[in-house]
Amino acid sequence: MTIERTFSIVKPNAVAKNVIGAIFSRFESAGFKIVGSKMLHLSKEQAEGFYAEHQGKPFFDGLVEFMTSGPVVVSVLEGDNAVQRHRDLMGATNPANALAGTLRADYADSFTENATHGSDSAESAAREIAYFFGEGEICPRTR
């Protein structure tokens, strides 16, 4: 058993639908511990910095515009094989391809407004967590 941390964003469209609690319930039902979480409204600079790897791609400006269109909830999840299990719970990036019962199948509106973000590797998780959280803001749970 390998306990990992992964990073999650509940995106503006899901926040607007008032499904934060439903998504958090799904995290906990899947065995994740939420060890850090906060709601914030991303500035253009924060969104551009977070998604810097996509700069220059055709969807970049629309992604930044969407991610700054309303509040988001950023979270740190902890659990066994957390990165892959969280990705499985989210479903395919394109909700049209997401399996029934995944977060994106249930809450996404489109390819861009796909309800959630999750780290794609342990390395990305560490970078993304550090982008939004100081170590003192993460509370490891032992029970």
Swiss-Prot record:
<feature type="binding site">
    <location>
        <position position="59"/>
    </location>
    <ligand>
        <name>ATP</name>
    </ligand>
</feature>
<protein>
    <recommendedName>
        <fullName>Nucleoside diphosphate kinase</fullName>
        <ecNumber>2.7.4.6</ecNumber>
    </recommendedName>
</protein>
<dbReference type="GO" id="GO:0005524">
    <property type="term" value="F:ATP binding"/>
</dbReference>
<feature type="binding site">
    <location>
        <position position="104"/>
    </location>
    <ligand>
        <name>ATP</name>
    </ligand>
</feature>
<keyword id="KW-0963">Cytoplasm</keyword>
<feature type="binding site">
    <location>
        <position position="11"/>
    </location>
    <ligand>
        <name>ATP</name>
    </ligand>
</feature>
<dbReference type="GO" id="GO:0006241">
    <property type="term" value="P:CTP biosynthetic process"/>
</dbReference>
<dbReference type="GO" id="GO:0006183">
    <property type="term" value="P:GTP biosynthetic process"/>
</dbReference>
<dbReference type="GO" id="GO:0046872">
    <property type="term" value="F:metal ion binding"/>
</dbReference>
<dbReference type="GO" id="GO:0004550">
    <property type="term" value="F:nucleoside diphosphate kinase activity"/>
</dbReference>
<feature type="binding site">
    <location>
        <position position="114"/>
    </location>
    <ligand>
        <name>ATP</name>
    </ligand>
</feature>
<keyword id="KW-0546">Nucleotide metabolism</keyword>
<dbReference type="InterPro" id="IPR036850">
    <property type="entry name" value="NDK-like_dom_sf"/>
</dbReference>
<comment type="subunit">
    <text>Homotetramer.</text>
</comment>
<keyword id="KW-0460">Magnesium</keyword>
<keyword id="KW-0479">Metal-binding</keyword>
<dbReference type="GO" id="GO:0005737">
    <property type="term" value="C:cytoplasm"/>
</dbReference>
<keyword id="KW-0808">Transferase</keyword>
<keyword id="KW-0418">Kinase</keyword>
<keyword id="KW-0597">Phosphoprotein</keyword>
<dbReference type="InterPro" id="IPR001564">
    <property type="entry name" value="Nucleoside_diP_kinase"/>
</dbReference>
<feature type="binding site">
    <location>
        <position position="87"/>
    </location>
    <ligand>
        <name>ATP</name>
    </ligand>
</feature>
<keyword id="KW-0547">Nucleotide-binding</keyword>
<feature type="binding site">
    <location>
        <position position="93"/>
    </location>
    <ligand>
        <name>ATP</name>
    </ligand>
</feature>
<comment type="function">
    <text>Major role in the synthesis of nucleoside triphosphates other than ATP. The ATP gamma phosphate is transferred to the NDP beta phosphate via a ping-pong mechanism, using a phosphorylated active-site intermediate.</text>
</comment>
<dbReference type="Pfam" id="PF00334">
    <property type="entry name" value="NDK"/>
</dbReference>
<dbReference type="InterPro" id="IPR034907">
    <property type="entry name" value="NDK-like_dom"/>
</dbReference>
<feature type="active site" description="Pros-phosphohistidine intermediate">
    <location>
        <position position="117"/>
    </location>
</feature>
<dbReference type="GO" id="GO:0006228">
    <property type="term" value="P:UTP biosynthetic process"/>
</dbReference>
<keyword id="KW-0067">ATP-binding</keyword>
<comment type="similarity">
    <text>Belongs to the NDK family.</text>
</comment>
